[in-house]
Structure formats: structure tokens, C-alpha cells
From Swiss-Prot:
Known function: One of the primary rRNA binding proteins. Required for association of the 30S and 50S subunits to form the 70S ribosome, for tRNA binding and peptide bond formation. It has been suggested to have peptidyltransferase activity; this is somewhat controversial. Makes several contacts with the 16S rRNA in the 70S ribosome.
Biased composition (Basic residues): 257-278
Subunit field text: Part of the 50S ribosomal subunit. Forms a bridge to the 30S subunit in the 70S ribosome.
Keywords: Ribonucleoprotein, Ribosomal protein, RNA-binding, rRNA-binding
Claim: Acetylation is one of the keywords in the record: no
Pfam family, one: Ribosomal_L2
Region (Disordered): 212-278
Membership in a protein family: Belongs to the universal ribosomal protein uL2 family.
GO terms for biological process, alphabetical: cytoplasmic translation
GO cellular component: large ribosomal subunit
GO molecular function: rRNA binding; structural constituent of ribosome; transferase activity
Entry protein name: Large ribosomal subunit protein uL2
Superkingdom of this protein's organism: Bacteria
């Protein structure tokens, strides 16, 4: 997918780029698959900010996606490729012979007119087909992977993401995640074949502050620009550095400090992700 750039006729246009939308074939969405989501803008039920730098952003409707892929053994045809404002991947509208319509994540290479099918048993290994991990050959790349059977896909759902099946052990399948983490997933879990499309999304340059405001992202104020009462880095005459290691406003170390709590599922992780040296 091509990235469109602009001539620098304003300073904000100079570095701005957008994805080419020629792959989008639909002019409107299916009404029955749209719903409203309440925008919390980072506030809790008391109206207090619990997650900073968030706002409502542009108005948008949520597209109901079929993450479970539980319409088994019925072949559907891709009727349209659509834009989804709530995710960086494109979505595909699948129409089934009984008239049922569902949205799925569009894997790379899936186009209008192609057929997709989901089954609990084995299927041909084609892009967009969904089946249980135990029926997918070792070495295949998959996306939209369940963590618990029947719960719906939770892993590898962003643009350009995929996991690779590395092997099997007892009732588990070994997956190499997009982060390079190796972990066990129950072989009864469903997954879709292929890589999530729209791979060039990572190369888009936002270019100006207004685009982030439309996305619901507010500006971030540096701690060193605050007063001592507001941040551990605040205060000082003129521009001053931080004393000691950088920390969050609440004193948690900001660079490489582990904050992940232990979980029961930690035993399913074979090896953690590899950190880049830089």
C-alpha cells in the first residue's frame, strides 16, 4: 500500500503523510454492524483523570468485528474492504449465503471476491481461513489468535502483525509472538491464516498536532517544565537537568523499570521478548 506525501505549501504539510485509500472499496458501512462507544476521555466514574493526555477526539462509530470466527463450515465472500476509525488495520465485509454479514480483520492479500471460511477441523492453508491451532502446519504465520478457546482473537490484531507457529507440545502450540516472545497457547484456540494487512501504517508521519487531537491524543507537558509541586523534575532556575534517574510524576523510574505484575499465565511464557540494544 502506497504512502501519499504532500508539497510543503504550509509548515504542517511539509512532513505529513497519509495512507493511499485506493484499497478501500466501500462508500458506506453496514448499519447493523455499527454501534456507539462511550468516550471516557481518560476519566473514571467520578470524572477524575486516571489516564493523562486523552480526550474524546473526532466522533466515530464502532464497527462490530467477528473476532471469534465461529460461523463454521459456511463459505463467505468478501464484498468490500472498509476503513475502520477504531483500528489501524482495514476490515473486510464478509457476506454468507444465508444473508448474514460480518466484519473481519483484512489480512494482507485478501481482496473483494475472495472466499473465506472458518472450521473447527482442518482446512486448506489460505489467507483469511480460520481454524484451530492444532490443525495449522508448523511454520505458518497467523493472526487474530485466541488466548482461551471460544473467547475470540486477542493476539496479533494490529496492522502488519502476525505470529508464527514454531511447534507443539502436549495440548499446547508454541508461538513466536510479534515481540519475539515465545509462549504456549492451547491448541484448541482459533487463529486466522496470514498477516494483518495495511503494513505501511507504521511509516505514516502524523506531521501536525491537529491530527493527534482528532485521534484523541492531548499534548504532553515535560516534567522539567513544571513546578516542583507537580513533578519530581520540576523547578530550578532556567533549564536544569534532572537529579538522578528520570521518573514519572509519581516517582516510578521511567527508563526500563519493570512494572509488570506476576500472572498465573507466566508459566506459559517460554522466553521473554528480546530488547534492542541501543
Amino acid at each position: 500500500m502506497a504512502i501519499k506525501t504532500y508539497k510543503p505549501y504550509t509548515p504542517s504539510r511539509r512532513f505529513m503523510s497519509v495512507l493511499d485509500s485506493k484499497d478501500i472499496t466501500a462508500k458506506s458501512s453496514v448499519k447493523g454492524l455499527l454501534t456507539k462507544l462511550k468516550a471516557t476521555a481518560g476519566r473514571n466514574n467520578n470524572g477524575r483523570i486516571t489516564s493523562r493526555h486523552k480526550e474524546r477526539g473526532a466522533k466515530k462509530l464502532y464497527r462490530i468485528i467477528d473476532f471469534k470466527r465461529n460461523k463454521y463450515n459456511i463459505e463467505g465472500k468478501v464484498a468490500a474492504i472498509e476503513y475502520d476509525p477504531y483500528r489501524n488495520a482495514r476490515i473486510a465485509l464478509v457476506v454468507y449465503p444465508d444473508g448474514d454479514k460480518r466484519y473481519i480483520l483484512q489480512p494482507s492479500g485478501l481482496k473483494v471476491g475472495d472466499s473465506v471460511i472458518a472450521a473447527e477441523g482442518g482446512l486448506d492453508i489460505k489467507v483469511g481461513f480460520a481454524m484451530k491451532l492444532k490443525n495449522i502446519p508448523i511454520g505458518t504465520v497467523v493472526h487474530n489468535i485466541e488466548m482461551h478457546p471460544g473467547a475470540g482473537g486477542q493476539l496479533a490484531r494490529s496492522a502488519g502483525m502476525s505470529a508464527q507457529i514454531m511447534g507443539r507440545e502436549n495440548k499446547y502450540t508454541i508461538l513466536r509472538m510479534p515481540s519475539s516472545e515465545m509462549r504456549y497457547i492451547l491448541s484448541e484456540c482459533m487463529a486466522s491464516v496470514g498477516v494483518v494487512g495495511n503494513e505501511d501504517f507504521i511509516n505514516v508521519s502524523i506531521g501536525k498536532a491537529g491530527r493527534n487531537r482528532h485521534r484523541g491524543i492531548r499534548p504532553q507537558t515535560r516534567g522539567s517544565a513544571m513546578n516542583p509541586v507537580d513533578h519530581p523534575h520540576g523547578g530550578g532556575e532556567g533549564k536544569t537537568g534532572t537529579s538522578g534517574h528520570p521518573v514519572s510524576p509519581w516517582g516510578t523510574p521511567a527508563k526500563g523499570y519493570k512494572t509488570r505484575k506476576k500472572k498465573a499465565s507466566d508459566k506459559l511464557i517460554i522466553s521473554r521478548k528480546k530488547h534492542k540494544k541501543g
